[in-house]
């Protein structure tokens, strides 16, 4: 067995052990035990790795699928907990920093905006944006609206009414961003005419937790969206133990031209896929965001510099802050 295979086997064994420990927890609601295990999991999955999670043995693949479901459940409980905590403030938006991973959303939203601005032909100045899978803490929408798209209206969609009720409370005292935010209880598969009203559609990482489910969302978007851009969050390498991996070819088959794929190797865990729907996008051959051409089937891949050491230090600090916030709450 070569060194790379040994590295992959060791990682899979470690992740399998963490999955077993997480699965035995009596609850995935925020607690020191839950936080410690998920911190260990993220720390194990974030560094660059040669693992291809789509080629795991069936037993490991089943473990991965179960782990992604556990991650989704834990993330939902964590966000609901902090949404309730923030709602206790007179102006919740002044206290978003109490959430341990708020800085990650700032960095991810900045990356997504920069990729859209760089690769979407003609730049990006959307009047209306849909964010599908916003959840009880719609940080991505908020950061984009407050920092990058000050004139844009955001419609946030999630199929759980309780999540929307929580999200709505966070914006009750804000007259700027709050006036540009609305929340709708709906599944992406049920959206048809609405999709034609948006210039950009964001698809969150856990929308359609199985890769095949997420892939099915792309033809639906392609059938109902107006000409414009779609941004899909995915994962790469060992981060595929945390989130579903979306194949850019599936997006292409859904009626989109994939303009760019970004696999960050820093504290931004999600990969980002930029795609564009246009009825005449192939009339003159695919084009990149700078006006040049690239061969059909090839996509520019952008990878920011690795800041893993800083990320580990930040995770440790946030873990301590989380424990303090739990006590205070």
UniProtKB/Swiss-Prot annotation:
Listed InterPro entries: Nicotian_synth, SAM-dependent_MTases_sf
Record keywords: rRNA-binding included?
Answer: no
Function according to Swiss-Prot or TrEMBL: Synthesizes nicotianamine, a polyamine that is the first intermediate in the synthesis of the phytosiderophores of the mugineic acid type found in gramineae which serves as a sensor for the physiological iron status within the plant, and/or might be involved in the transport of iron.
Q: What organism does the UniProt record list as the source?
A: Hordeum vulgare
Q: What is the gene called?
A: NAS7
At the top level, the lineage of the source is Eukaryota
Identify the EC number(s). Answer: 2.5.1.43
Q: Which UniProt keywords apply?
A: S-adenosyl-L-methionine, Transferase
* Gene Ontology molecular function, alphabetical: nicotianamine synthase activity
Keyword S-adenosyl-L-methionine found: yes
A Pfam family of the record is: NAS
This enzyme catalyses:
3 S-adenosyl-L-methionine = nicotianamine + 3 S-methyl-5'-thioadenosine + 3 H(+)
Protein family? Belongs to the nicotianamine synthase (NAS)-like family.
According to UniProt, the name of this protein is: Probable nicotianamine synthase 7
Q: Name one GO biological process term.
A: nicotianamine biosynthetic process
């Amino acid at each position: 067995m070569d060194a790379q295979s040994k590295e992959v086997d060791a990682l899979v064994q470690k992740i399998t052990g963490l999955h077993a420990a997480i699965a035995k927890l009596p609850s995935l609601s925020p607690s020191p035990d839950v936080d410690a295990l998920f911190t260990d999991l993220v720390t194990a999955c974030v560094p660059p790795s040669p693992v291809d999670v789509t080629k795991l043995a069936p037993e490991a693949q089943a473990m991965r699928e179960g782990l992604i479901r556990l991650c989704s459940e834990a993330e939902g409980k964590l966000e609901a907990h902090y949404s309730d905590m923030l709602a206790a403030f007179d102006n919740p938006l002044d206290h978003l920093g109490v959430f341990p991973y708020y800085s990650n959303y700032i960095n991810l939203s900045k990356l997504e905006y920069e990729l859209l601005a760089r690769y979407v032909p003609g730049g990006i100045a959307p009047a209306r944006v849909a964010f599908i899978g916003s959840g009880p803490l719609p940080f991505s929408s908020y950061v984009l609206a407050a920092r990058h798209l000050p004139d844009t209206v955001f419609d946030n969609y999630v199929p759980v009414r309780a999540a929307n009720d929580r999200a709505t409370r966070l914006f009750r005292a804000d007259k700027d961003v709050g006036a540009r935010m609305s929340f709708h209880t709906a599944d992406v598969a049920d959206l048809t005419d609405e999709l034609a009203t948006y210039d950009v559609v964001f698809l969150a990482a856990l929308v359609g937790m199985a890769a095949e489910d997420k892939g099915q969302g792309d033809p639906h978007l392609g059938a109902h969206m107006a000409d414009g851009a779609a941004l899909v969050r995915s994962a790469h390498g060992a981060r595929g133990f945390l989130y579903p991996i979306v194949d850019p070819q599936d997006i292409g088959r859904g009626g989109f031209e994939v303009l760019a794929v970004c696999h960050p190797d820093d504290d931004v865990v999600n990969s980002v896929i930029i795609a564009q729907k246009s009825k005449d996008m192939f009339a003159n051959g695919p084009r990149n965001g700078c006006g040049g051409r690239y061969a059909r089937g090839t996509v520019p891949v952008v990878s920011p510099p690795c800041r893993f050491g800083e990320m580990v230090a930040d995770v440790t600090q946030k873990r301590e802050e989380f424990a303090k916030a739990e006590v205070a709450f």
